[in-house]
Regions:
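Short, structured interface segments
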Residues: 36-51
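Short, well-ordered coil/turn segments that N-cap beta-strands
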Residues: 29, 54-56
Length: 234
């Protein structure tokens, strides 16, 4: 039989909260907890955040040119990062429960926001903030058969949106929208992680981003393909 169990991190889920350890101890099994607790907490980051806040962990992912521009209005909407970077974005989508954009992104890019470049058994929920109902009924997001929440007159603001997603057990939300949507989240202090992908290109007719990242205390650097990446957390 089992004589001893080592638990890295307690379960904060209010439906469980310590009951598992109590059951083991009542059965005469010795329980040790706290081994590699910090590492376990990092691995369960989104789940712990959801349990404690009943809202998803919010990640922003944005790509800019070398000057901080998010788009080049001299061209048709197109990707300006490498294939390797795109694969990392699809992995990020796979690791998420929902992807969010605003109406401007759907109108400009007509994106799919699905996982296609890595193997997956499910697609994330796509969320569109469109309070003025400007998105065309023919948009790919509304017609591909994958899960979507199109928020029009029923949009009640960002805190209410995060509460709704939390009630749906969405544990991680990735924002892939443009600067308007992202800045609304930043201004309300609702972003937990900010992933800035920096391309080597220079836009001819740039769209400045003007993101205020002063609320983030930590930054890590990485590479997604040839692109440099800065990951900001609190």
């Amino acid at each position: 039989g089992i004589n001893e169990v080592i638990v890295a991190h307690g379960d904060p889920n209010p439906l469980v909260r310590g009951n598992g350890i109590s059951v083991l101890e009542q059965a005469g099994i010795k329980v040790q907890s706290g081994l590699l607790e910090k590492e376990a907490a990092e691995q369960m980051r989104e789940f712990l955040h959801w349990c404690q806040n009943r809202r998803p962990y919010v990640t922003v992912k944005i790509a800019t040119d070398s000057t901080g521009s998010v788009d080049d209005l001299s061209l048709e909407a197109q990707r300006f990062t490498s294939d390797e970077c795109l694969e990392r974005v699809h992995q990020l989508r796979k690791d998420s429960c929902a992807i969010l954009v605003g109406a401007n992104t759907v109108i400009r890019d007509d994106p799919q926001l699905t996982v296609r470049l890595v193997q997956t058994d499910r697609q994330p929920l796509r969320v569109i903030i469109d309070p003025n109902n400007r998105v065309s009924p023919s948009a790919k997001l509304l017609n591909d058969g994958n899960p979507v929440q199109h928020l029009t007159e029923n949009f009640r603001g960002l805190p209410a949106l995060l509460d709704m997603l939390g009630d749906m057990e969405i544990q991680r939300l990735v924002i892939e929208g443009g600067p308007t949507t992202i800045n609304y989240f930043l201004e309300d202090g609702l972003v937990d992680e900010f992933i800035h992908v920096i391309s080597e290109v220079n836009h001819v007719k740039p769209v400045p981003s003007n993101f205020d990242l002063s609320s983030f205390s930590k930054v890590e650097t990485s590479n997604w393909g040839i692109e440099k990446v800065k990951i900001y957390t609190k």
